[in-house]
């Protein structure tokens, strides 16, 4: 099981690419991207909140609804998969492992990212929380991932960048995990990942060979 945003794909890089194009289209300086990225908080700030902050400071010539739609498109339409990540997925599957994406978020945006990154052609299944009505770290998300490939959590691993979603969810179910640290230090006192990785390629290879 592998998380999508900022794990399989660099969601922040994709969002920034789209954001810069949006600012350029509206005739605004690229320097605004920095504070917008801060408000965005890796995609965890609700889109209406980001849109309101932008409209309060910038003359975008857009309605709030149109800006929300544009912000969703920024990350969805610029989702890209690194070749080395694709190769790691292929190695894991060639070794007999089933690879399932497990991602929080609305179905249209998340499935759009998966498709635009070409992941729909590489993985065995994808579970989007919006389709099942609950988010990671709730057990139902992980059980749905196992069921999607006719498997069991008994021999599963979870890979992700979020301590409070990916790693906590795995911990509660007794599933070993790999945390993609992205330059951060682990701070949760009550649980820890089984392994910490510098890159998603390292994470996939570790889980596949454990």
Where in the sequence are the language-model features?
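N-terminal helical cap/lid subdomain that shapes the substrate entry/recognition surface
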Residues: 1-87
């Amino acid at each position: 099981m592998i998380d999508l945003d900022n794990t399989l794909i660099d969601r922040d890089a994709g969002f920034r690419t789209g954001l810069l194009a949006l600012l350029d289209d509206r005739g605004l300086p690229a320097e605004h991207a920095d504070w917008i990225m801060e408000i965005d908080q890796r995609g965890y700030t609700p889109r209406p909140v980001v849109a309101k902050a932008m409209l309060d400071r910038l003359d975008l010539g857009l309605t709030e609804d149109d800006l929300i739609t544009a912000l969703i498109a920024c990350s969805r339409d610029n989702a890209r998969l690194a070749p080395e990540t694709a190769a790691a997925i292929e190695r894991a599957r060639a070794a007999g492992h089933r690879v399932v994406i497990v991602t929080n978020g609305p179905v249209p945006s998340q499935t759009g990212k998966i498709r635009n990154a070409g992941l729909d052609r590489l993985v065995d299944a994808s579970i989007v929380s919006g389709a099942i009505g609950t988010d990671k770290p709730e057990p139902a998300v992980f059980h749905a991932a196992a069921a999607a490939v006719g498997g069991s959590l008994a021999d599963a691993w979870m890979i992700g960048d979020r301590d409070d979603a990916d790693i906590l969810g795995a911990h509660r179910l007794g599933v070993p995990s790999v945390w993609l640290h992205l330059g951060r230090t682990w701070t949760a006192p009550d649980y820890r990942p089984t392994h910490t990785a510098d890159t998603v390629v390292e994470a996939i290879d570790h889980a596949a060979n454990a």
